[in-house]
Amino acid sequence: MRPSMSLIRSVSRVARRGYSSESVPQRKVAVLGAAGGIGQPLALLMKLNPLVSQLSLYDIAGTPGVAADVSHINTRSEVKGYAGEEQLGEALEGCDVVIIPAGVPRKPGMTRDDLFNINAGIVRSLTAAIAKYCPHAIINMISNPVNSTVPIASEVLKKAGVYDEKKLFGVTTLDVVRAKTFYAGKAGVPVAEVNVPVVGGHAGITILPLFSQATPKANLSDDYIKALTKRTQDGGTEVVEAKAGKGSATLSMAYAGALFADACLXGLNGVPDVVECSYVQSSITELPFFASKVRLGKNGVEEVLDLGPLSDFEKEGLKQLKPELKSSIEKGIKFANQS
């Protein structure tokens, strides 16, 4: 996986990739839920990304203000805000990438699955609009529970006759970001140099960081590995509790969402060897959806990479996560097919 790159220095990043300002393709990106806790900082970070030429910000309300604020930033992209369902089609038309952080946030005592009944309906309606107005766009699903919302989106797209498994992604990048941060702290290595694959799903025990494959290598005890794994799995809860009922992991999620969207854009633009972890349709295991390393390209998913060698602890973790992940997938598919 590529090391995380500073979005603030995004212009120089593009120069390092060999683009001139004239050669960067025109790319329209939409953020659905742009007035929310994740959506606002995500809109800011996408405005800083020079791979974006048009930034479309949509929410049920509040978006004109967010769009006006962000539009004053002196970067490449043109920003437009859209509010209300009647403007959703215009927001989506011509999009290359659609990022969906829409939905209600977690509160203390809530799991991601507690959000299901509200967020599942939101995801279903937004995906139906994507199927109608930009059926070939890459979809980055942030709305929780991702283990279920990605299967919901797949079923909606299938019903519309436009499903392309290569273009639907569950964004699990925050799990990777957390695993890198926590590992670097314990291993005493520079965090910018750290890579840690995270596989499985995006909730609780379904999150499985593969610390045995982490680089740079560090000789950490089994107890340290178990503690790092648990902290990565509980990272969202850690933030919810720290915010004492006043929010969830909005800022770090926006950062992770922007990183993954940047990777998708780079792949679309033909940058070679862009590899990130994501929750996608997969044949890596017997489950229809699974998070693992994915090579990104001009069509979205170019290749879903194998899990690689696992430690005994990771093999057990993989075994333990499968029933819960299977249940979440089935829950999403059932919801999508109820109506």
Swiss-Prot record:
Enzyme Commission number: 1.1.1.37
Gene Ontology biological process: malate metabolic process; tricarboxylic acid cycle
GO cellular component, one term: mitochondrial matrix
Keyword field: Mitochondrion, NAD, Oxidoreductase, Transit peptide, Tricarboxylic acid cycle
Boundaries of the annotated transit peptide in chain numbering: 1-19
Annotated TM spans: none
Listed InterPro entries: L-lactate/malate_DH, Lactate/malate_DH_C, Lactate/malate_DH_N, Lactate_DH/Glyco_Ohase_4_C, Malate_DH_AS, Malate_DH_type1, NAD(P)-bd_dom_sf
GO molecular function: L-malate dehydrogenase (NAD+) activity
Catalytic reaction list: (S)-malate + NAD(+) = oxaloacetate + NADH + H(+)
Cellular localization per UniProt: Mitochondrion matrix
Oxidoreductase as UniProt keyword: yes
The keyword Transit peptide belongs to this UniProt entry's keyword annotation: yes
Annotated substrate binding sites: 106, 112, 144, 178
Positions with a binding annotation for NAD(+): 33-39, 59, 119, 142-144, 253
SUBUNIT field: Homodimer.
Name of the molecule in the record: Malate dehydrogenase, mitochondrial
Species of provenance: Fragaria ananassa
